[in-house]
From Swiss-Prot:
Name of this protein: Sulfate adenylyltransferase subunit 1
Lineage, opening ranks: Bacteria, Pseudomonadati, Pseudomonadota, Gammaproteobacteria, Enterobacterales
HAMAP family in alphabetical order: Sulf_adenylyltr_sub1 (MF_00062)
EC number, as in UniProt: 2.7.7.4
Keyword set includes Lyase: no
UniProt family annotation: Belongs to the TRAFAC class translation factor GTPase superfamily. Classic translation factor GTPase family. CysN/NodQ subfamily.
The organism of origin for this protein: Salmonella enteritidis PT4 (strain P125109)
Complexes and interactors: Heterodimer composed of CysD, the smaller subunit, and CysN.
GO molecular function, one term: sulfate adenylyltransferase (ATP) activity
Length: 479
């Protein structure tokens, strides 16, 4: 057991009291991002080291690994605490998204260490999708780079409102205040074009030496602001999902016996109470909540983020992918939408292509109708393109095979975010965030003959490359 943990347990009066105190601490999810070799993994290693979150056996192993794979000479290579893949250690880079957990007396943290190489931008977007704050590292010798801009834009696109710009490697520029001021001004000029009302803070630091990470630096007395750890401990995170209407995507129909039928999932936003009237989409059927079942027993009320099972007072047809919301809420299913897309495949995204899309627990097919524009990462301007390349970001018009219950992503990331899946390889090729909804898709149902339905099913099964639309999608969506 490490020293700080033992001291905390002693201060709380025992393990049980300490565990209860941990449950009541606020949780901050954040990621580190930026360009290649800006020191993202080293920064996380320094945070873990300086908050005494490393056990003795880990420290001993780190000494040995630093001799074999380290890039810091005789010093500890703290990046090895995070870079766990063999390829990462051999190349000295981050490839996968690495998650680490630690806590201080004030807060609990989940860190996502994301890769800086452009070819791994897809992994960075994955890590950012669940975070509340982004630490953007900038090498003090290089200043603001393309990847800095790209990661900043992706972070804000994914709804992150708090950005901490950590200007790293200040030790390599002799802790120069003018260098810090110049990079700060350059980034603020760029950030004027970023969407949304952002909270941007700047911290000069050296992850390798520990300056301004967990303790104030004696080498930068000209900086009077908080350390990075102080920023993380005190930043006020207001989660929009707590204030949004209730949304409950059904992930699983739980029926362990004939006497129980519940609908399991994670409450995406808002809250739900026993006795509350709810509506099921796309069917529109209403019922009321009889029980809210959790691992710890029944509850009278559940809030956003809780994993629950809802039991209703009526036996109605609900399946995976359906959406439950308050009965007095109006959410018209849409077949057409404008989607912000981060493309992750070698093959470009082009109009006319069809993909499987997955939204919460719902999976359907969608067709790319048009690409309105691609974002130029250097200046955030819009330019006309015929296709969206690997790591490209743009606004795309899409049509779904069936009407979907969607929210705007900035209002609700769970019911407004989706992924693109290649229908032949089943590989995730893109991420999408709903920007605009077009409800013109609420068309009257069409009746098809049995022969038409059989032929349609046959074509879709044996000739998927024809991109035939599922005729039942329309019928079920309008039912």
């Amino acid at each position: 057991m490490n020293t700080i943990l033992a001291q905390q347990i002693a201060n709380e009066g025992g393990v049980e009291a300490w565990m209860i105190a941990q449950q009541h601490k606020s949780l901050l999810r954040f990621l580190t991002c930026g360009s290649v070799d800006d020191g993202k993994s080293t920064l996380i290693g320094r945070l873990l080291h300086d908050t005494l979150q490393i056990y003795e056996d880990q420290l001993s192993s780190l000494h040995n690994d630093s001799k074999r794979h380290g890039t810091q000479g005789e010093k500890l290579d703290l990046a090895l605490l995070v870079d766990g893949l063999q390829a990462e250690r051999e190349q000295g880079i981050t490839i996968d998204v690495a998650y680490r957990y630690f806590s201080t007396e004030k807060r609990k943290f989940i860190i996502a260490d994301t890769p800086g190489h452009e070819q791994y931008t897809r992994n960075m977007a994955t890590g950012a999708s669940t975070c509340d704050l982004a630490i953007l590292l900038i090498d003090a010798r290089k200043g603001v780079l393309d990847q800095t801009r790209r990661h900043s834009f992706i972070s804000t696109l994914l709804g992150i409102k708090h950005l901490v710009v950590a200007i790293n490697k200040m030790d390599l520029v002799d802790y120069c205040e003018e260098t810090f001021a110049r990079i700060r001004e350059d980034y603020l000029t760029f950030a004027e074009q970023l969407p949304g009302d952002l909270d941007i803070r700047f911290v000069p630091l050296s992850a390798l030496e520990g300056d301004n990470v967990a303790a104030q630096s004696a080498n930068m007395r000209w900086y009077s602001g908080p350390t990075l750890l102080e920023v993380l401990e005190t930043v006020d995170i207001q989660r929009a999902v707590d204030r949004q209407p209730m949304r409950f995507p059904v992930q699983y129909v739980n029926r362990p016996n004939l006497d129980f039928r519940g609908y399991a999932g994670t409450l995406a936003s808002g809250s739900v109470k026993v006795g509350e009237r709810i509506k099921v989409l796309p069917s529109g059927v209403e019922s009321s909540v009889a029980r809210i079942v959790t691992f710890d027993g029944d509850k009278e009320e559940a809030c956003a983020g809780e994993a629950i099972t809802l039991v209703l007072n009526d036996d109605i047809d609900i399946s995976r992918g359906d959406l439950l919301l308050a009965a007095n809420e109006t959410l018209a299913p849409a077949r057409h939408a404008a989607i912000d897309v981060v493309w992750m495949a070698e093959q470009p995204l082009a109009p006319g292509q069809s993909y499987d899309v997955k939204l919460a627990g719902k999976k359907t097919r969608a067709r790319i109708e048009a690409i309105r524009y691609q974002i130029d990462i250097n200046n955030l301007t819009q330019r006309d393109v015929e296709s969206l390349p690997l790591n490209g970001i743009g606004l795309v018009e899409m049509t779904f095979d069936e009407p979907l219950a969607l929210d705007i992503y900035q209002q609700n990331p769970v019911t407004g975010g989706l992924i693109f899946i290649d229908r032949l390889s089943n590989v995730t090729v893109g991420a999408g965030m709903v920007r605009e909804l077009d409800e013109r898709g609420a068309t009257p149902p069409v009746e098809y003959s049995a022969f038409e339905l059989e032929l349609n099913a046959l074509v879709r099964r044996h000739f998927p490359h024809w991109d035939a639309r599922d005729l039942l999608g329309d019928k079920h969506g309008a039912a």
